[in-house]
């Protein structure tokens, strides 16, 4: 019409409800955005979560009370481009496609065991006389360690096999045998005496723990806070 578009009677009757609905949707999206601004969604592996991060979350919360840390614990690499994931911490070479990876630590590793098991290990060759716990998920190499420290390759290493790294740690703590572990992951249990490093012969591997972020993702306040906190906390552990 000359005066412009005229809504049909049915639409005119529904306008108040539609307006209220759109207003509610806008308010909900604004509320969601505000929540996202202070929630840091972090995906990690089980051993990193249970052996290192869980004992230090309180420190992060105290340093950054405005940030709520939400953990997604997964054995596989989560798609970091998802809107509900801000970043992750993963163990490997740091060459995953589609992400930027920053090494935070965990490159040195060596055998650990409970003190009673360590009493049976007077020399490297004694590893043939105790169970060697096998972690199917680990990238840490017994062969590389053997070569580095000069352990006879003919010595067979046998023991229980676990498909979960955290359970393998529990097995070592419960005196089931010797486990190859990253120094960063065994630091707390060594500090409190539940585990010891019987040979004190660490080696440096090509793998480590990386902070990973989807390529192209902006540097948010919460991500920057985590990065800075890790830079201080990891060397101290």
Residue positions per predicted region:
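Beta-hairpin "wing" of winged helix-turn-helix
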Residues: 1-9, 198-199
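Alpha-helical "hinge/linker" immediately C-terminal to small N-terminal DNA-binding modules
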Residues: 5-34
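Immediate post-signal peptide segment of exported/extracytoplasmic ligand-binding proteins
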Residues: 34-40, 126-128
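Central regulatory/effector-binding core of bacterial HTH transcription factors
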Residues: 37-97
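Short, well-ordered beta-strand segments
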Residues: 41-43, 88, 112, 133, ...
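C-terminal regulatory
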Residues: 82, 94-206, 233-237
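A late-sequence structural motif
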Residues: 200-237
């Amino acid at each position: 019409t000359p005066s412009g578009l005229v809504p049909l009677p049915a639409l005119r009757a529904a306008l108040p409800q539609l307006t209220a609905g759109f207003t509610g949707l806008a308010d909900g999206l604004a509320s969601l955005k505000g929540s996202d601004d202070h929630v840091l969604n972090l995906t990690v592996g089980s051993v990193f979560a249970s052996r290192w991060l869980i004992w230090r979350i309180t420190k992060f919360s105290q340093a950054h009370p405005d940030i709520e840390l939400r953990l997604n614990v997964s054995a596989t690499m989560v798609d970091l481009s998802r809107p509900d994931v801000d970043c992750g911490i993963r163990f490997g070479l740091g060459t995953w496609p589609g992400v930027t990876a920053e090494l935070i630590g965990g490159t040195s590793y060596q055998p650990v065991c409970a003190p009673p098991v360590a009493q049976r290990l007077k020399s490297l060759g004694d590893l043939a006389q105790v169970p060697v716990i096998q972690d199917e998920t680990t990238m840490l190499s017994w062969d590389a360690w053997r070569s580095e420290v000069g352990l006879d390759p003919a010595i067979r290493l046998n023991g229980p096999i676990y498909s979960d790294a955290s359970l393998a740690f529990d097995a070592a703590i419960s005196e089931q045998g010797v486990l190859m572990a990253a120094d960063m992951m065994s630091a707390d249990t060594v500090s409190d005496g539940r585990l010891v490093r019987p040979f004190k012969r660490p080696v440096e591997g090509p793998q480590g723990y990386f902070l990973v972020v989807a390529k192209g993702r902006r540097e948010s306040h919460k991500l920057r806070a985590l990065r800075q906190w890790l830079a201080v906390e990891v060397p101290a552990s």
